[in-house]
Each structure stands twice: as C-alpha cells, then as structure tokens.
C-alpha cells in the first residue's frame, strides 16, 4: 500500500553498528519504501527480509515461537474489546501473575461497559484495591460512562478514551478487531533493539519515532493480534531484561546484539528515573470501637482514597 509516513526533519540517528552518523535528510512526506531504506541503514539486518512464502522472517519466527510458548491468560480467550481493555489497563503497572486474579474478580462484578458505568466510584475503587495506581480505576470508570453502553470500534475513538494511550489503543484494536496496529511497550522496545542492533535511546523523541516505525514495519498485517501478543510474550519470557534465554532463542542466529556481545547493553535509555523521597506521618485516632479516617481530596494518585490523618514532611 502506498501510504506515507511523516518524517522528522534533519535529525541525526546513531546506529549500533556504524561509527558514522546517519543523516536523516529533510523530508516533509516520504514514501514508505524510502523510510524502510532508512531503517535498513540504521539496523544491521535488512528489515524487509522475507521467507519463501513472502512473510517477514522476523515476524514468522515470533509467531511460530508464540504458538508453541504462549501463556494461557483469561483475557486471551475472548475478542470482547471491553474485557481486553480491562486487562490492558490492569497490566499497565501490574505484573501478569498479580493481575490475573484481580482481573477475574473485577469482570465478575463489572462484566460489561454498562455495569461499570452504572457503578458508584467508591465501589469501583474497592474492587481495584490492592492493584495500586488508583487513577487507572477512576479513568476506567469515567471512560465507561462516556461510552453510552457501547465500546468504540475505531482506533481514534479508542485512543480518545480517558487513560488510553497509543500502546493500549493498538492492543485493543488489534486483539479485538484484528486491526493492523503495532504495539510498542517495554518488551517490544527490548526485542527490536537487540535483534536489529539499534542503540538510539528508546526514551528520546528520535527513538520513539524510530521504534514505532520499525514495529509497524515488522507487524504481520494478516495476523496482527497473533504477532502483537507474540512479541510481547517473547520479550516477557524469552528476551528478558536480565538473563535472556539466548541459547534457545529462535532468533539467535540473526540477532545483532548477540553477535556483537551487546545484549546486556540494549536497549538504551538516556534518562534515569529520578527518585524523590516523601515522608508520611500518620496519626492513629481511636474512640471506643471507632477509628478516625478521612477521604483524601488532594489531586494525586491517592485521590478519593480513605486514610488516617496525615502530616507529610520533607525529612524523616
């Protein structure tokens, strides 16, 4: 298909396997084939390599691996966009093993959009208790109220939901509707960076655009759900952040990072997480059988949660 990709102007992108800088010429609109050629110059491996059947070699390996190693998860047994949405929001900041039971409990009480929309916010928060990052629950509730009982069916509409970003929208649309949108999360960054040997920082503007384009190029458009689920599982199980299983990796023979001995160095992040210490001093007040608590009104991640009287200080 002859679609176009808007390309950023006069940027310098660094290749893991070239000492020289690759100058990105100034384009306003560049045909996709030209962009693929640029990806080829950045990556050690030709991103367009295909099998005899015309399928991308990388994508085929990911899908074949997934068919043999996929994790059995309850939200994968349905193409219901509502259930997929709930699972993706839960997994934004929660490990799969921890989120499993919470997902089942949540959908048992709120099995569809309307039941969630009709619920009281305090009840929604109660069923979210233990997952943390409670703004996710508030966003779910607000988004459900905006749907009028029907989950949206287009990518722009899904993306417009409160609390839904590009990754979540791509996951929902590919898993529920079979739409060709590539997911890009931490697992995808890691797999693509290592396999293609790209050391452009994943948290830079250039890196985000580059990896989004590379992910889109690798996407199997005939099986987007299978491929997206596959590459995420591959990153979570096979190509892990620490101690990846390179010995039994189906991509080992053509992995740039492995051949260069740089698996532990990729992907690259340019900014380290800044940690700020906060000190909460809670006051326990009890009168007979009653304990004093109040609802937190501050506009932060704990908004509308109940807590003991609090004094926050800058030192311990």
What do these predicted ranges mean?
Residues 2-4, 14-17, 40, 52:
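Intrinsic-disorder-associated, low-complexity terminal segments enriched in Asp/Asn/His/Tyr and depleted
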Residues 11-13, 18-22, 31, 45-46, ...:
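Polybasic, lysine-rich low-complexity intrinsically disordered segments
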Residues 33-34, 40-71, 77, 236-316:
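Intrinsically disordered, low-complexity, charged terminal extensions of DNA damage-control enzymes
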Residues 25-28, 37-39:
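Leucine-biased recognition of intrinsically disordered, low-complexity hydrophobic segments
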Residues 2, 12, 41, 63-64, ...:
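Intrinsically disordered, low-complexity segments enriched in small/polar residues
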Residues 2-3, 23-26, 48:
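Ser/Thr/Pro/Gly-rich low-complexity, intrinsically disordered segments
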Residues 56-61, 65-245, 251-260, 264:
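Catalytic cores of DNA base-excision repair glycosylases
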């Amino acid at each position: 298909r002859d679609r176009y990709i808007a390309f950023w102007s006069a940027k310098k992108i660094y290749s893991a396997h070239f000492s020289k800088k690759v100058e990105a010429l100034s384009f306003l609109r560049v045909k996709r084939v030209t962009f693929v050629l640029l990806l080829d110059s950045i990556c050690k491996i030709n991103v367009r390599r295909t099998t005899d059947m015309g399928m991308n070699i990388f994508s085929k390996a990911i899908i074949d691996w997934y068919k043999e190693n996929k994790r059995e998860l309850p939200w994968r047994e349905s193409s219901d966009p509502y259930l997929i949405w709930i699972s993706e929001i839960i997994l934004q900041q929660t490990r799969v093993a921890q989120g499993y039971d919470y997902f089942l409990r949540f959908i048992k009480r709120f099995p569809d959009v309307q039941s969630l929309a009709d619920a009281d916010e305090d009840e929604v928060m109660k069923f979210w208790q233990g997952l943390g990052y409670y703004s996710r629950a508030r966003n779910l509730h607000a988004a459900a109220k905006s749907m009028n009982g029907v989950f949206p069916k287009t990518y722009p509409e899904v993306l417009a939901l409160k609390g839904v970003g590009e990754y979540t929208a791509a996951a929902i649309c590919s898993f529920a509707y079979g739409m060709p949108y590539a997911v890009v999360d931490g697992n995808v960054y890691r797999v693509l960076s290592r396999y293609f040997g790209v050391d452009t920082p994943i948290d830079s503007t250039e890196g985000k655009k580059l990896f989004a384009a590379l992910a889109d190029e690798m996407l199997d458009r005939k099986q987007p759900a299978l491929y997206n689920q596959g590459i995420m599982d591959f990153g979570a199980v096979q190509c892990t952040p620490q101690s990846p299983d390179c010995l039994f990796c189906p991509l080992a023979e053509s992995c740039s990072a492995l051949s260069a001995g740089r698996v532990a160095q990729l992907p690259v992040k340019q900014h380290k997480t800044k940690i700020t210490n906060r000190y909460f001093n809670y006051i326990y007040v009890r009168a007979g059988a009653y304990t004093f608590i109040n609802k937190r009104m501050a506009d932060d991640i704990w908004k509308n949660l109940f807590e003991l009287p609090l004094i926050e200080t800058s030192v311990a």
